[in-house]
């Protein structure tokens, strides 16, 4: 049994056999990390020359040595193989000049229903394995410490088809998606030379929500590394087309109202038809308001296809991932993100991928998490990851460097 480096091809071959895996543990991500200045190694724990555990280990220089990290890994088929892997990894890190080794496992610590109620026991044995080997745990957290959340909202896609996808959404989600699709929103996959459009959306959103956006160069490199396994999607709306659709639908409604009025002339005491007339008349008035809004949009934007929102979706054999997104608040009433989500789930079905990961939520279930509320429309469930573990091959050296940095005001 030994820890060794392996080829990209051998890593990918093994990675495709495991049941749970993030896109972060992929050859595509390794390529992206390398292009972003990291030193990347494909490492494996082998038994009788067969890979039992594998991971992408990336490194960056820091004061006093290397920062080494395994994010969303390692990958394995048998849990029993994790302990010897983690134990040997400590020696490997020390021998290769690491001052800090960080591991963020992808194992699920606990599962919850869509509302945040536990549906499984806490899987403490995963943590115990690392702690008993001397790895320090940052603790179980909520929110997005370091920009990454340990709480994911996911949806199992097995058994769901294009025909019954809408039915699988929540009680609120079904009408939300139906309404969003009624506006005439078009979806487009961006080419590399169009990624500034995506960057504009995410910049607007990050400014509004006060978080650090990725650079255009990052998105371009992501596009290059992932190729057909990533979709940079935008949702657009032509307000001339939107207005025409409103007139058409209002015309159909007017015919229904006219028929009801004639029926009520014959049978004026029909409570059912009176209620229908009230409902249809209210809908007719709503169309008038929407047409007025549409005219204002036409005055402002003319006949162009206006971008409402955008999302980056990533595909792996085990799961697809909703990674980055943004929208323009001016167009919130068109619910474009819901149309993008439906597209992603349809694409997940088309590619035969068994799980869709909406990624981060805060892990706070008091109603304050608007991101969670949006994702709940699609009727998934919640998984909690274990968080971050750290090992310091030379703890005194690390503490001394940290103290010096603090004294110099660089911490």
Residue map of PLM features:
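Conserved acetyl-CoA-binding loop-helix of GNAT-fold acetyltransferases
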Residues: 80-91, 332-346
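Active-site/acyl-donor-binding loops of N-acyltransferases
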Residues: 5-8, 18, 31-32, 119-160, ...
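Flexible, glycine- and charge-enriched loops at secondary-structure boundaries
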Residues: 78-79, 116-123, 166, 212, ...
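Generic hydrophobic alpha-helical scaffold/packing signal
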Residues: 220-223, 311, 345, 372, ...
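Catalytic phosphate/metal-binding cores of nucleic-acid and nucleotide-processing enzymes, i.e., regions
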Residues: 69-71, 313
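A short, internal acetyl-CoA/4′-phosphopantetheine-binding micro-motif in the GNAT/acyltransferase core
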Residues: 71-80, 158, 325-334, 362
């Amino acid at each position: 049994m030994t820890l060794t480096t392996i080829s990209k091809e051998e890593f990918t071959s093994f990675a495709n056999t495991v049941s749970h895996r993030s896109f972060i543990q992929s050859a595509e991500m390794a390529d992206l990390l390398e292009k972003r200045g990291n030193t990347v190694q494909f490492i494996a724990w082998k038994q009788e020359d067969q890979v039992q555990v594998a991971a992408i280990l990336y490194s960056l220089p820091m004061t006093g040595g290397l920062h080494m990290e395994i994010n969303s890994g390692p990958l394995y088929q048998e849990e029993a193989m994790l302990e010897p892997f983690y134990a040997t990894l400590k020696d490997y890190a020390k021998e290769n000049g690491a001052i800090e080794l960080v591991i963020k496992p992808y194992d699920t610590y606990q599962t919850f229903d869509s509302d945040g109620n536990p549906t499984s026991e806490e899987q403490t044995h995963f943590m115990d394995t690392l702690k008993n080997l001397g790895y320090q745990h940052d603790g179980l957290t909520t929110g997005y410490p370091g920009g990454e959340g340990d709480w994911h909202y996911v949806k199992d896609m097995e058994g769901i088809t294009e025909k019954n996808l809408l039915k699988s959404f929540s009680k609120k989600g079904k009408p939300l998606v139906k309404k969003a699709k009624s506006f005439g929103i078009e979806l487009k996959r961006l080419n590399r030379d169009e990624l500034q459009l995506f960057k504009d959306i995410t910049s607007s959103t990050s400014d509004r929500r006060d978080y650090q956006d990725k650079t255009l160069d990052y998105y371009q490199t992501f596009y290059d590394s992932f190729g057909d396994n990533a979709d940079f999607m935008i949702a657009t709306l032509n307000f001339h087309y939107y207005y025409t659709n409103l007139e058409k639908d209002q015309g159909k409604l007017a015919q229904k109202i006219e028929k009801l009025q004639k029926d009520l002339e014959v049978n004026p005491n029909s409570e059912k038809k009176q209620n229908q007339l009230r409902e249809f008349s209210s809908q007719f008035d709503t169309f008038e308001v929407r047409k007025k809004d549409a005219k204002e949009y036409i005055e402002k934007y003319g006949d162009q296809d206006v971008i409402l929102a955008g999302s980056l979706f990533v595909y792996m054999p085990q799961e697809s991932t909703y990674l980055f997104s943004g929208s323009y608040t001016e167009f919130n009433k068109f619910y474009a993100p819901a149309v993008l989500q439906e597209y992603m789930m349809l694409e997940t079905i088309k590619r035969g991928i068994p799980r869709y990961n909406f990624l981060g939520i805060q892990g706070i279930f008091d109603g304050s998490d608007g991101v969670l509320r949006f994702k709940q429309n699609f009727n998934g469930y919640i998984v909690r990851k274990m968080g971050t573990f750290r090992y310091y091959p030379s703890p005194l050296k690390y503490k001394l460097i940290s103290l010096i940095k603090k004294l110099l005001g660089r911490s």
